[in-house]
A protein has these predicted regions:
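Pentatricopeptide repeat
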Residues: 66-70, 97, 101, 117, ...
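N-terminal targeting peptides
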Residues: 1-222, 231-242, 246-249, 270-274, ...
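Inward-facing hydrophobic residues that define packing positions of alpha-helical scaffold repeats
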Residues: 88, 101, 108, 121, ...
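C-terminal interaction modules of eukaryotic adaptor/scaffold proteins
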Residues: 568, 573-576, 580-628
Length: 628
């Protein structure tokens, strides 16, 4: 009955999702079985080699050894793995062939550490000496030749495949072992599960897990933790939580790693309350929270902007005798920088230094960025110098912050000096780097240079993204070169770069600036046809375009459509309408709009009053009311 209950609980898992596990994965290709060369064991060269290895007389080893002679010597030394290791370490890899490598691997697998055998297998895989199937067959033949009964040499082949980032080869070895009536160790299976998970191939992870289950390979806590992680990566958090009960039904106690995995899943999805529930469950089961648990919660709270709670959790962590690491401090620093609370952010930086925790580049980057946002450029520069003085090298993010900051300040010279410095220090520029520079060149009407830099991006092996295209389109629109701007839109389509609402808003603004509001209106339909929803800026742009032309009927039509779509009018909306009404000498309606905007809590600015004064200067004057 217990087995039936467990299998019912297992039924919610995609154990056999879209696979027929009875279908062989590998084609049944004909292959020649491995046959070891059998030279005369009385060969004087082999005899000399044998003695030289045993006596560590490496200078006596002949330089013209053939692979068959090496294989014979290895066979004779199969009971002396340490001697074989010393010999292999002194032999150039290209002197070996697949049979001699396989013999060496089988012999070296008898050493206490698997690393020497693994290293040799990794070399063979990296050199593309043979296919995985051929290596498996060669190891099987060597194992038979040496009358070696342990099967862990095949587990080593699975591990080597994982270390070489070739989990498919590891899965092939798994099936070849099953065909040979052998079963991999659970450690090998866990390694392979993790390898597929790292490769984000969760379908293969489930396939292997199902095959393990059918083959009755007993799981461990590590197995369950991996599969819980798979469910979290797939966003199936409820099933991940249920899997904890499932592992308990099999007699396994969840560990702090188990719970940390699920907590990480909840925090990454912004489900902080569910993460707190998992913390309570840990406490009920007597599982202590570790530094990583606290770090996850602090990170999750910071992402949600709940900084005071994050700080309280941090203090609780310290009070419990746990030592925060640089990552935890960096999380808090970044959180407070994002909120504009630089004094608190710097206090955490100072605290970590006092406690002997070295700041990293991730400590300094948010601080530098926050200083630039507040216009404290000299302090930002000083902080970068302090950073370098501590031996922390600026990375691409640091340079992007600096370059973008100086671009926004309009300091083109300084921005390009940093760009040159970045390249000279071997820090590769990114799309963000080039976008900032293209933007500032466009803003300073240096369109030829901006276009040249845009072309350079492709030569650097980077793909211009929508943000970079938008910056260049904005430059051409600002210079009333709409033909070139629309050519860039076509180029985006050719390069499979999907335009966004910013792209279309920029083009609409450019058309409105040259008096082509009707064409801009057509773009509104085009963007909807592409599945891009207009935003309030789209409507403000058209309202402004029609108001500038004095076409107030269409301007108010788009104001009404804007309201119907749930967008509230902004200061720009009212200013555009008031400007258009004043241009048409409709002062009464302009005054009504002024009263309306004030009643909605929108404060008029200089542009509002300038429009009213200019429009009504020859009329009856402006009636001041409602506090205006």
């Amino acid at each position: 009955m217990r087995k039936i209950r467990l299998l019912k609980r297992l039924s919610f898992l995609p154990v056999r999702p879209h696979y027929s596990l009875t279908i062989p994965i590998l084609p049944n290709q004909p292959h020649r079985p491995f046959s070891s060369p059998t030279p005369d064991s009385q060969d004087p060269t082999v005899h000399l080699l044998h003695n030289a290895i045993l006596s560590s007389q490496w200078h006596s080893i002949p330089s013209n050894l053939s692979p068959s002679q090496i294989s014979t010597a290895l066979s004779n030394l199969h009971s002396s793995p340490h001697c074989v290791l010393s010999f292999i370490q002194r032999l150039e890899f290209n002197r070996l062939d697949l049979p001699s490598i396989s013999l060496a691997v089988v012999i070296l697998s008898r050493l206490p550490s698997p690393r020497p055998a693994l290293n040799l297998l990794n070399q063979a895989i990296a050199a593309n000496l043979a296919s995985n199937r051929q290596i498996f067959d060669a190891l099987a033949a060597a194992r038979g030749q040496l009358k070696s009964t342990p099967t862990h040499v095949f587990d080593l082949l699975i591990k080597a495949a994982c270390e070489s980032n070739k989990p498919d080869d590891g899965l092939q070895t798994f099936y070849l072992m099953k065909t040979s009536k052998l079963l991999p160790k659970i450690e090998s299976c866990n390694n392979l599960l993790s390898s597929f998970l790292r490769s984000k191939r969760t379908d293969k992870t489930w396939l292997l897990y199902a095959e393990m289950f059918r083959s009755k390979i007993p799981s461990t806590v590590i197995t369950f933790n991996i599969m819980i992680n798979v469910l979290c990566k797939e966003g199936k958090l409820k099933k991940a939580k249920a899997f904890i009960s499932f592992m308990e039904d099999f007699g396994f106690k969840p560990t702090v790693v188990t719970y940390n995995t699920v907590i990480h899943g909840y925090c990454s999805k912004g489900k902080i309350e569910s993460a707190f529930e998992m913390l309570d469950e840990m406490t009920e089961k007597g599982i202590d929270h570790d530094s990583y648990t606290h770090g996850l919660m602090i990170s999750g709270l910071c992402k949600e902007g709940r900084l005071e709670e994050a700080s309280a959790f941090f203090q609780k962590m310290v009070d419990n005798g746990l030592i925060p690491n640089a990552i935890t401090y960096n999380t808090l620093i970044d959180g407070y920088c994002n909120k504009g609370n630089l004094s608190r952010a710097f206090s955490y930086r100072d605290e970590m230094c006092t406690k002997g925790i070295e700041p990293t580049v991730c400590t300094f980057n948010p601080l530098v960025h926050a200083l630039f946002i507040e216009g404290r450029i000299d302090e930002a520069d000083a902080l970068v110098k302090e950073m370098e003085g501590r031996g922390v090298s600026p990375d691409a993010v640091t340079y992007n912050i600096l370059i973008n900051g100086y671009c926004k300040e309009g300091d083109v010279k300084k921005a390009f000096e940093l760009f040159d410095e970045m390249s000279s220090k071997g820090v590769r520029p990114t799309n963000v780097t080039y976008t900032s520079l293209v933007y500032v060149l466009c803003k300073t009407n240096r369109m030829s240079e901006a276009n040249g830099l845009f072309e350079r991006v492709r030569s650097e092996g980077l793909k211009p993204d929508v943000v970079m295209f938008n910056a260049l389109i904005d430059g051409y629109c600002s210079n009333s070169n709409m033909e070139r701007a629309f050519l860039l839109l076509k180029e985006m389509d050719r390069r499979n770069v999907r335009p966004d609402e910013v792209t279309y808003n920029t083009l609409m603004r450019g058309l409105c600036m040259v008096g082509k509001a009707d064409e801009a209106r057509g773009l509104l339909d085009e963007m909807r046809g592409r599945g891009i929803e207009p935003d309030f800026i789209s409507y403000n742009t058209l309202i402004s375009g029609y108001s500038r032309k004095g076409n107030m009927n269409d301007a108010f039509k788009f104001r009404d459509e804007m309201l119907n779509r749930g967008f509230n009018p902004t200061l720009l909306t009212y200013n555009a309408l008031i400007q258009g009404l004043c241009k048409n000498e409709d002062g009464d309606q302009a005054e009504e709009l002024l009263k309306e905007m004030v009643s909605k809590g929108i404060t008029p600015d200089d542009s509002t009053y300038i429009s009213l004064i200019e429009g009504l200067s020859e009329g009856d004057g402006l009636v001041v009311s409602n506090g205006v």
